[in-house]
């Protein structure tokens, strides 16, 4: 009977502690991923050793997640350090069938619902690209950003393209997103769900916006696309003299939202493995913030210790005490 009680108690303890240990591991993984993004946001390639070290730690905790994030960081670095930005029209060599979708990112409308010139400039690049790749779909993405209800960026963009010669059966509209991050999330889901023939995308937007958009679409498809992942194969930009610029803050913020982890731009992890100890100057955080920045939750003490103590109490309660020797024995 004592053996049975001990066994039941042991199993009960495992059942109590196991979920907490898993939760602790999940929080640890999240913290590591936050550090990886913060390192690249603040230091770029100068934090290569720290990022590599964090990726190794993440892989030890969760091999699948670790390998996924190694690829994410490789692609993110490529987007910022090696990817060419093409102007005027998409480059040569892209798929020439309906496996390609040209994704045109929206831009805030005027108060009356009309399009600003910069958005028209994007559409002119998109139309020329669509003529160069006549089998490709064209997806316009952008929600209601004017004072006129029912008028979306995507709707206005689509109407302009149709008026200027784009075939109706090539046009796809996504009219609910209100940020670049949502452009990537909602557009990707539409293509995954409704256009399985589409395997690759090319982004059309303003010159300062290309890397930001590319980073969001890359992260969305790598982290959530699975077997339906869309390959980013090209880009085309309209040239602007806009004071806006594609900030690393916007990229880091967008990737964090897509990865479902907090992002705190003021959190500066130290460089332990590199010579430089001060982060380079980063762009002012301000600018293009259409959504609230996710708050970083306060770290909680793990409750595994508490449950372990509870398990010990249960052991004491369930295990019978040895009978004391009486004087008559």
Q: How would you label these PLM feature ranges?
A:
Residues 1-8:
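Bacterial N-terminal signal peptides that target proteins for export
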Residues 23, 300, 323-326:
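N-terminal cationic leader/targeting segments used for protein routing and processing
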Residues 306-316:
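Core hydrophobic alpha-helical transmembrane segments of single-pass membrane proteins
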Residues 292-307:
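Juxtamembrane/start-of-transmembrane alpha-helix segments at the extracytoplasmic/lumenal side
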Residues 12-20:
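Hydrophobic core
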């Amino acid at each position: 009977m004592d053996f049975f009680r001990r066994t039941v108690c042991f199993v009960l303890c495992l059942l109590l502690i196991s979920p907490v240990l898993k939760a602790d591991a999940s929080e640890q993984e999240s913290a590591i991923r936050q550090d990886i993004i913060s390192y690249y946001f603040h230091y770029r390639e100068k934090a290569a050793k720290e990022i590599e070290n964090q990726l190794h730690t993440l892989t030890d905790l969760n091999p699948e997640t670790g390998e996924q994030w190694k690829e994410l960081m490789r692609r993110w670095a490529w987007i910022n350090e090696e990817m060419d930005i093409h102007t005027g029209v998409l480059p040569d060599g892209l798929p020439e069938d309906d496996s390609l979708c040209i994704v045109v990112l929206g831009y805030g409308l005027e108060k009356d619902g009309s399009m600003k010139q910069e958005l028209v400039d994007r559409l002119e690049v998109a139309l020329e690209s669509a003529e160069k790749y006549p089998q490709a779909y064209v997806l316009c993405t952008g929600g209601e950003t004017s004072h006129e209800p029912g008028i979306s960026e995507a709707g206005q963009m689509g109407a302009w393209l149709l008026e200027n010669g784009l075939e109706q059966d090539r046009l796809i509209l996504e009219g609910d997103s209100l940020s670049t991050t949502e452009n990537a999330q909602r557009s990707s889901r539409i293509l995954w769900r409704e256009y399985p023939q589409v395997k690759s995308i090319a982004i059309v937007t303003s010159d300062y916006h290309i890397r930001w958009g590319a980073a969001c679409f890359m992260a969305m498809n790598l982290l959530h696309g699975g077997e339906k992942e869309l390959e980013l194969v090209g880009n085309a930009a309209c040239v602007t003299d806009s004071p806006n610029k594609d900030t690393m803050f916007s990229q880091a913020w967008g990737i964090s939202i897509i990865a479902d982890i907090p992002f705190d731009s003021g959190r500066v992890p130290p460089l332990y493995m590199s010579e430089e100890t001060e982060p380079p100057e980063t762009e002012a955080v301000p600018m293009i913030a259409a959504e609230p920045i996710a708050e970083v939750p306060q770290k909680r003490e793990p409750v595994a210790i508490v449950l372990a103590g509870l398990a010990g109490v249960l052991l004491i309660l369930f295990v019978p005490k040895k009978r004391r020797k009486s004087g008559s024995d």
